[in-house]
Amino acid sequence: MNEIKKKQIAILGSTGSIGTQALQVIEEHPELYEVYALTANNKVDLLIAQARKFMPEAVVIANEEKYAQLKEALSDLPVKVYAGAAALCQIVESGPIDVVLTAMVGYAGLKPTMNAIRAGKAIALANKETLVVAGELINQLARQYRTPILPVDSEHSAVFQCLAGEVGNPIEKVILTASGGPFRTCTMEQLKTVTKVQALKHPNWEMGAKITIDSASMMNKGFEVIEAKWLFGVQPSQIEVVVHPQSVIHSMVQFEDGAIKAQLGMPDMRLPIQYAFSYPDRINSSFDRLDFSKCTNLTFEQPDTKRFRNLALAYESMYRGGNMPCIVNAANEVVVAAFLRDEISFLGMSDVIEHTMGQVSFVQTPTYDDYVATDAEARRIARELICK
């Protein structure tokens, strides 16, 4: 009997929330998956521990100042050690890699993802900013190189699963669910004084700091709307957000006959990660199962875009197109970092994003170089607005 060839997986951002959970999935299925490469930005100690445990072919630390420490710590192992942004982009092109999990945070994920697509690697996409910033470009590349993009976001994985077996059946509407975050019931007055400590307490999901703040401000949901447009080929008007505080229904698809398919489950990111790895197959897992006898109260409500303006700004950027979503992403990365440093208020983040949208040069059909220039200009303007 032939031995099953293990899928070789590269994890970009292995020390973050998604990356560490992906390693749990791999650990649970050592007969199916093998870690080929691990990368991190700064968390060198955790990267060292992961490398010693999973014995990848290579590791990359983006922060070059940490290279010597990483190299020394792994000197007794047959693991190649690299550092810097260029190495990050090159490692994804390695021949044996089957799947690249893009779990790094923010705009930094764009270039490595493009390189992985050009190298013909299946993309398990957890870095939503890649499609927010350059969705059209990424889709063109994926078509050109016949590379599958498998969504890892729980909402997009849910939609992806709902679309299984529906080839050729027109989508009427994609319905993305949102928990509403920790401030769902706060008044505008209360939102003026919320702190980063409060914002970092998400009611349902365990996530990294940046995405947790984005969830609190609903920018995360705005980005997911843009991501859905590119992943599923729907118009902005076909994407609806509904607040579902229990996070049991992960998203839904309504078809032209009015039928709605939904994907349900426990709020556990390992499930969509595993599905992206195993697609089109499903494999067993030890994850907690949903107990319907305990789901006695599933509720739904409309999002309030007056209190959570970021969602409206994301929709506006999607309707305007061009480099506008790139502008929003860059400004958002700057304001979230400032909020985490206590340099801007929670509501002030939306003000800076909106003003940045009005000041950065608009490009209707941007190239990759345009995106790079837009990102730099938007960050500069957002920082200037914060300092005013």
Swiss-Prot record:
Instruction: List the residue ranges forming a coiled coil, or say none.
Output: none
Residues that bind NADPH: T15, G16, S17, I18, N127, E129, G208
Among the GO molecular function terms of this UniProt record, one is: NADPH binding
- Listed name of the protein: 1-deoxy-D-xylulose 5-phosphate reductoisomerase
The UniProt annotation places 1-deoxy-D-xylulose 5-phosphate binding at K128, S154, E155, S179, H202, S215, N220, K221, E224
- Which EC numbers does the record give? 1.1.1.267
Q: Which cofactor does it need?
A: Mg(2+); Mn(2+)
Pathway in which this enzyme or protein is active = Isoprenoid biosynthesis; isopentenyl diphosphate biosynthesis via DXP pathway; isopentenyl diphosphate from 1-deoxy-D-xylulose 5-phosphate: step 1/6
Which InterPro entries does UniProt cross-reference here? DXP_reductoisomerase, DXP_reductoisomerase_C, DXP_reductoisomerase_N, DXPR_C, DXPR_C_sf, NAD(P)-bd_dom_sf
Q: Tell me which Gene Ontology terms the entry assigns under biological process.
A: isopentenyl diphosphate biosynthetic process, methylerythritol 4-phosphate pathway involved in terpenoid biosynthetic process
State the top-level EC class. oxidoreductase
Q: What is the stated purpose of this protein?
A: Catalyzes the NADPH-dependent rearrangement and reduction of 1-deoxy-D-xylulose-5-phosphate (DXP) to 2-C-methyl-D-erythritol 4-phosphate (MEP).
Instruction: Give the reaction(s) catalysed.
Output: 2-C-methyl-D-erythritol 4-phosphate + NADP(+) = 1-deoxy-D-xylulose 5-phosphate + NADPH + H(+)
Kindly list the positions annotated as binding Mn(2+): D153, E155, E224
Disulfide bridge map:
none
Give one Pfam family.
Answer: DXP_redisom_C
